[in-house]
Structure formats: C-alpha cells, structure tokens
A protein has these predicted regions:
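N-terminal intrinsically disordered, cationic/polar leader segments
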Residues: 2-66, 70-147, 151-180
Length: 180
C-alpha cells in the first residue's frame, strides 16, 4: 500500500464530505465549499469522522493515483477549515505593487505597469508596497496565481531584483570582474 494513500483523512467538526457517483467529492466547511472529480478507479469511503481511499490492484498507475487521490481530498479538507496562504516579496529599485478592488497592478521596471485580476476564489492583499499575500481555500488556485505573479519578473541572480516567495532563497552570483 502507498504510505500516503493508506492514511485515513480525519474530518474535523463543522466539515461535511459528500461522495457522489463518478467519485465527485464535495467538501463543505466554515470557509466555503470545494468539489472535485477524482479518479474513478479509486474507492473512496466515509466511515464516521474519517475518509479512506483504497485501490483495486497494484498496477503502477493505481499506486500513483492512490496517494494523489488521498492528498487531493486532504487538501480540500484543510482548505475549507484553515485556507491557504502564499506570500510574495518584491525586491528592486522602483519595483512596487498597488491594489485597486480586484485588480493588482505591478510596477516591475518595464515600460508599462502589469495589471492582474484576482481569479475567482482567490484574494490578494498588500502588506506595504512590496509584500503580496495571496489567500484562498483552493490550494491549486492559490499556488497557480502566486506562480503567475512571480513569473512576471522572476528574481535574477546578480542583484536579486524581482518577485520571490518569502521562503525562497536566491542563489547569488558574483558579477564579472573588471580589467586591472
């Protein structure tokens, strides 16, 4: 059995999990509702306050889907109870961000500002002019939006200018040395 796949998923109080046909799993909690169609091959059962995932056989594909299915359900449960958050930092002279309604405007040294609209179910907030906090209940959407923002100006290795995750460490390079 998959080490991750065989672990049961604990359902906290205030969260309901519904498993419909074709493995459509709907999780409702205090922060909202998430639903997702999971691989049909997996068998998802709810027993009391926990959900278990089992696989029909030991083919390589089934083994990989086993852990994936369990993790996706777990991420949905955590999302509707606690939510997810990612923090981005902007470094560089003149690099900054502004928020206006659902529009995030980035000034990143290009000849034009970059405008990004928050996707549905994801919120962005600013802490000062150089910290962006992205939060939501869907881990995939939060991570995707954060990656899209970062891709607008990824950090460069010489001065570290650009947008990076708050936990990310930029490997610096020495610049070229001049003639003597």
């Amino acid at each position: 059995m998959s080490r991750i796949g065989k672990m049961p998923i604990a359902i906290p109080a205030g969260v309901t999990v519904e498993i419909a046909e074709n493995n459509l799993v709907t999780v409702k909690g205090p922060k909202g509702t998430l639903s997702r169609v999971l691989p049909i091959e997996m068998e998802i059962k709810q027993e009391g306050a926990e959900v278990t995932v089992s696989r029909p056989n030991d083919l390589k594909r089934m083994k990989s889907l086993h852990g994936l299915t369990r993790t996706l359900i777990h991420n949905m449960v955590v999302g509707v109870t606690e939510g997810y958050k990612k923090t981005l930092e902007i470094n560089g002279v003149g690099y900054r961000a502004q928020k206006n309604g659902k529009t995030l405007t980035l000034f990143l040294g290009y000849s034009h500002p970059i405008e990004m609209i928050d996707p549905e179910g994801v919120e962005s907030a600013l802490e000062g002019q150089n910290k962006i906090v992205i939060s939501g209940i869907d881990k995939e959407k939060v991570g995707q939006y954060a990656a899209e923002i970062r891709s607008k100006r990824a950090p460069e290795p010489y001065k570290g200018k650009g947008i990076k995750y708050n936990y990310e460490h930029i490997r610096r390079k020495a610049g070229k040395t001049g003639k003597k």
